[in-house]
Amino acid sequence: ISNLPYYAATFFLRTFLELEHKPELMVLMFQKEVAENVLATPGSMRLLSVITQMLCYSEKICDVPKESFEPAPKIDSSIVKLVPKQDSFITPINYVPFCDLLRAGFSSPRKTISNCLSNSLHKPKSECNSMLLNCGIDPQRRAETLELAEWELLFDNSYEELFSLE
């Protein structure tokens, strides 16, 4: 159980997520906006929400208004419960490559997933379109709209091709 310093909360969370032997349960207080990012659903997903939700079951316990503290900070907080998944497809071996795919997909939030992958990975757009379509993903969608299962499918079916050196 922790009240993380807000300026370092994302760093600490990513560090916990990278551990091979994670705590059985994490109850953390975040700045409310960070908690919303961690708990986001398709349509507003971010890199942090995808990787957190791939590795942990997550739920908001409650919001904590700024007036609950003395002196009152400028922001509201939220308490989030994270329980590491035992059955996540992400392992210590594929954690970094999966994050590479997410970074490429979320590299330009206003662009389509196809454009992001093509630009970030220096691959022809037609190749990225083909890989996305083979996974049942419309290349015109944005990364924030993809479901967790779609990210997993894209990684499983396309990672070697996307990141191969030519």
Placement of each model-derived feature along the sequence:
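Class I S-adenosyl-L-methionine
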Residues: 1, 8-143, 153-166
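Ca2+-coordinating acidic residues in Ca2+-binding motifs
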Residues: 150
